[in-house]
Amino acid sequence: MAGVARMLAAVVCAIMPAAAMAAGGVGALEPSGWVRAHATFYGGADASGTMGGACGYGNLYAQGYGTRTAALSTALFNDGLACGQCYKLVCDRKTDRTWCKPGVSVTITATNFCPPNWDLPSDSGGWCNPPRPHFDMAQPAWEKIGIYRGGIIPVIYQRVPCMKKGGVRFTINGHDYFQLVLLTNVGAAGSIKAMDVKGSKSPDWMAMAHNWGAQWHSLAYLTGQGLSFRVTITDGQTLVFPNVVRPGWRFGQTFASNIQFK
């Protein structure tokens, strides 16, 4: 185990964003220790069956998550607050040399929920039953570390920073007095701890509430106003995205910022 950990260890620079809108003085997420779990796969050889899901990301190809994704068990999913987190997984050859591929790892993003199956025991089909940590991975990601016929493999995993290109994106859905905001392409910790919104006609920040998956909502009347967001991710970093949503926006639109967590 120690040899695998040394081989895969990554050095992460805790660099705070230089932009003046950064706040907090908290360093970026560093890799966690290694933890044991198991992993299965779903979604087909092209991962087309992984689209949608309990994080609300929709088309994972279009959103940039691709096929390196997984559904998390209850023990990891945290009612959707883990959406967007990244994990590095290695098949544990000390436990299973038959179905584990040697010397390789894969990094996935949490994009879905693997529900419990109370009709089956936790060690025989009810893989996602609490309190088991379990990854139901997109098949192409799973096959990076496991041999297809194995079906289920023991893994060791660690949470790692998410590496993203471009800025955080905001998709606005809902209706008047209910703005439902989906965040995608979130770097560093990947998952959201808190979020505030301010309209161009509003003097103050207004706290948003976690709705489901990677989506947060506001009950204020903000239709048509330019919108700024203040986002805190789960490693404690806070960034302000000023006027990222232009006045006159419509529900269903996505707005890409040029700001990213590091």
UniProtKB/Swiss-Prot annotation:
Keywords: Cell wall, Cell wall biogenesis/degradation, Membrane, Secreted, Signal. Pfam families: DPBB_1, Expansin_C. GO terms for biological process: plant-type cell wall loosening. Residues 52-167 form the Expansin-like EG45 domain. It comes from the Eukaryota. It is found in: Secreted, Cell wall; Membrane. The keyword Cell wall biogenesis/degradation applies. Residues 1-22 form the signal peptide. Residues 177-257 form the Expansin-like CBD domain. GO terms for cellular component: extracellular region; membrane. Expressed in roots and flowers. Its main location: secreted. It is a peripheral membrane protein. Gene3D superfamilies: Expansin, cellulose-binding-like domain, RlpA-like domain. Belongs to the expansin family. Expansin A subfamily. May cause loosening and extension of plant cell walls by disrupting non-covalent bonding between cellulose microfibrils and matrix glucans. No enzymatic activity has been found. May be required for rapid internodal elongation in deepwater rice during submergence. This is Expansin-A13. The gene is EXPA13.
